[in-house]
Each structure stands twice: as structure tokens, then as C-alpha cells.
Amino acid sequence: MNIWAPAPEPPTKLGRHRQLAPGCGLHVSPIQLGAMSIGDKWHPYGMGTMDKEASFKLLDAFYNAGGNFIDTANVYQDETSEEFIGEWMEARGNRDQMVVATKYSLVYKRGASFEEIPQKTQYVGNSLKSMHISVHDSLRKLRTSYIDIFYVHFWDYTCTIEEVMNGLHNLVAQGKVLYLGVSDTPAWVVSKANNYARMAGKTPFVIYEGEWNITMRDMERDIIPMCIHEGMAIAPWNVLCAGKIRTDAEEERRLKSGEGGRTLLQFDGWLRNETERKVSKALEKVAEEIGAKSITSVAIAYLMQKFPYVFPIVGGRKVEHLYANLEALDISLSPEQMQFLNDTVPFNKGFPYLLFGDGSDYNIVHKAAGHYDKWPAQQAIRPQK
């Protein structure tokens, strides 16, 4: 027998792991399992929930398909998301095989009454105390001695960059956290934080998580260029527009059955607006051209093929939806199809990009002076045949 015989083929392409970022050697599945639905506390607020049995079933399906990358937060489902994931890893004995990302900064004790916890101001924000309490609670709930990726959930504008980055670095030095991430934060803050970390010998951020989908492309203005420059991975959330990427037939079925859809943070309800219907039609057209079974898988592939080091966070409660979304790993979109989807909802980068470009080509000033051949940008990984 060959001691270095190749590993067996993974059950699905989810098991073809890839390097997280240029600045991070961690290898993860190309799609993350979003765990905001895992847990049983948020149903009253318009969010789907899952009891422990259903949560374990979904986690098993993800793991058995080759997935190892889970995204959660201290606040999800009033802390039961972390608890269920921790119990599942302990029961399956697979903690070291998994890459678990969690977060701090949102008020994660909001599920407790003010009779139980009269003062909650220490359980929210970016402060060192909030960080300290949260990471210790997350370690306990996840039943682990370390967190793979620890995120600042949002920037609260009350702490200095030095306080946050020094505190995060200390967690890395103590072995409680391996890598650092940042979410829902302006590009200038992240750039300044990483510059401070490098200059001061601290640990920089290696991944950015933010809202990005075919209808919401604001991250393409400053955040994604910043990630490319900083050597950071990109973790888009809400990639399926809160479940509003659906066909007319699917929406009609939900209306008739009374199933409805997610309403948490959806201030205009669960039904699609005009833009979402237009986008769904465009995705349906592309799906028909390439023979894809699901328009959601086309929406995921669209993001993954725009830039390198993109790891979409895909949630949900049903195993069949998880498997349907894995079709994204088999889809290869042509430049014409990518442009067609780009044009469905025009995106204006604004000043100064409209004046002098975004660096993807030489601008009008250069072109007035001469002719150039530009080196191509690094491309995303395309599906393996």
C-alpha cells in the first residue's frame, strides 16, 4: 500500500475544501452553513426555528456532504444556536474537524428578562469587557476550548481600534481564538485596524462578513476592494435575499398553503417586491440556459464567481434545500451571463469611481496618454469537472 495514497473522493463538491484567504492557511468548505435558524427561540419574531432533533439532522447532512464551515453568533436564537452546535459536535466527536465562526457585540442576553438580568449594558458593544464575557460564554456553549474564527459583529463607534485589536490579539495569544473576522463594519475602520495590527505586532482580520447579494451590491463599492487589498476572505450573508429569491410558482404555492416566509427584519413583509421579482426572473432565465434545477443555486454561483475567496453563508432549515443549494458548486456562468445578471439591478459606484474608474481598467486620463496591456486580476475558482 502507498502511505501517501490519495484521499477518497468526497461525497459532494462541498468536500473539496479551499484556502480561506491569502493571509490565512485554514482550509474550509466552499459554502458555509449559516446557523441563525439553528435553535428554538426566535419563532415569535418571524424567524424560522429548529428544535434540537431537526438541528442535528441539518448539521449531520452538512457534515456528511463534506461541509466543515459553520457560521453562528452569540446572539442567534437567544444563544441556543451555539448550544445546539456545541452539543452536536460533542455527540459526534468531530470538533477538530469543524471550523466554527462565532461573533460578539450584539446584546446576546436580550432573551433574558430584566428580572433575570436587571443590567445588560455589559453584554453589548465592542468593549473589552463585552468581548471577555462573550468569548467565555461562547466557549462554554460550544463545548470547546477554542473558537476557529471570532468576529466583531458590528462596529459600535465607542471603542478605539487599539482597545478592540489588543483585546482580540490577547485571545489569540491565549489560544482561545485562532483567527479574527469582522462583520458589518466600514472599510476604512477595517483597513485602519489591520494596519494598526501589523504595525503593532498584533493579529489582523482575515475575513469580512457582510450583506451582499444580486440585489444589494454595496459591498462592491469599497469593502470588497478592501478585502482584496488586505488579503481577506469574503463571507456574504443574506445571499438569497431573506428567501425572496423564488419563482412565481413557489410564491403562489406559499400563498395557497399559508406557509409564508421569513419576516424577521423584513419590514415590507415576506412577499417579493418588484426588484426581487425581476431578479428572480433573470435567475430563472439563466437557470434554463444552463440546465440548473434551482434559481437559488444560480444566485449563489453568481457571487462565488465574481471574486476569489468568497464563501457564501447559506442557512435554512430543510435538508432538501441544503442539497439543492449545493448545485451552485456545479454551475459555471459565462461572462455574458454574469453581465446579464449584473445589469438586472444596475449598480452605481458613485464618486470618485465614476470619474476616474475603479482600477479594473486604465482610466480616461491614462488612455489619453497612450495604450496599455493590463495584467488580469485573480479569478475565482471554477467548478471541477
From Swiss-Prot:
Q: Which residues bind NADP(+)?
A: 238-248
- SS bonds (residue pairs): none
- Mind listing the UniProt keywords for this protein, alphabetically? Aromatic hydrocarbons catabolism, NADP, Oxidoreductase
Consult the record and explain the modifications the protein receives after translation. Answer: The N-terminus is blocked.
| InterPro entries hit by this protein | AKR_Detox_Biosynth, NADP_OxRdtase_dom, NADP_OxRdtase_dom_sf
A GO MF term: aryl-alcohol dehydrogenase (NADP+) activity
**Organism expressing this protein natively:** Phanerodontia chrysosporium (White-rot fungus)
Highest taxon of the lineage: Eukaryota
Broad EC category: oxidoreductase
Similarity remark: Belongs to the aldo/keto reductase family. Aldo/keto reductase 2 subfamily.
Question: What EC numbers are recorded for this enzyme?
Answer: 1.1.1.91
Q: Which reaction is the catalytic activity of this chain?
A: an aromatic primary alcohol + NADP(+) = an aromatic aldehyde + NADPH + H(+)
A Gene Ontology biological process annotation? catabolic process
**What positions does UniProt annotate as the active site of this protein?**
76 (proton donor)
- Name-wise, this protein is Aryl-alcohol dehydrogenase [NADP(+)]
